[in-house]
Amino acid sequence: MARIAGINIPDQKHAVIALTAIYGIGKTRSKAILADVGIAEDVKISELTEEQIDQLRDGVAKYTVEGDLRREVSMNIKRLMDLGCYRGLRHRRSLPLRGQRTKTNARTRKGPRKPIKK
């Protein structure tokens, strides 16, 4: 298994799909990285040479991925909450942010129902 950005990349998958195992890299960014490096999308990771894997590592290193990206996202949410803006308040109360209704159909964001004690 190749190790890129601290993640074990699956060997038996095509390169374009295998790179999506890294947090912050989807299919589009994966295709862009492979095009920059000059590796075909349909090549399996197990067929790549060490030199090509090193090139992939360098290509992925240009982007914010994994722990750095998770930290950046959580810091952005924390900043909104500290500002006290509307989005920050909605985050703090675990409610939908983007104008969805909450009388019904907000169970995913609100979590399971809490019974009322008598």
Swiss-Prot record:
GO terms for biological process: translation. GO terms for cellular component: cytosol; small ribosomal subunit. Residues 94-118 are annotated as: Disordered. GO terms for molecular function: rRNA binding; structural constituent of ribosome; tRNA binding. Disulfide bonds: none annotated. Keywords: Ribonucleoprotein, Ribosomal protein, RNA-binding, rRNA-binding, tRNA-binding. HAMAP family: Ribosomal_uS13 (MF_01315). Located at the top of the head of the 30S subunit, it contacts several helices of the 16S rRNA. In the 70S ribosome it contacts the 23S rRNA (bridge B1a) and protein L5 of the 50S subunit (bridge B1b), connecting the 2 subunits; these bridges are implicated in subunit movement. Contacts the tRNAs in the A and P-sites. Belongs to the universal ribosomal protein uS13 family. Part of the 30S ribosomal subunit. Forms a loose heterodimer with protein S19. Forms two bridges to the 50S subunit in the 70S ribosome. This is Small ribosomal subunit protein uS13. It comes from Vibrio vulnificus (strain YJ016).
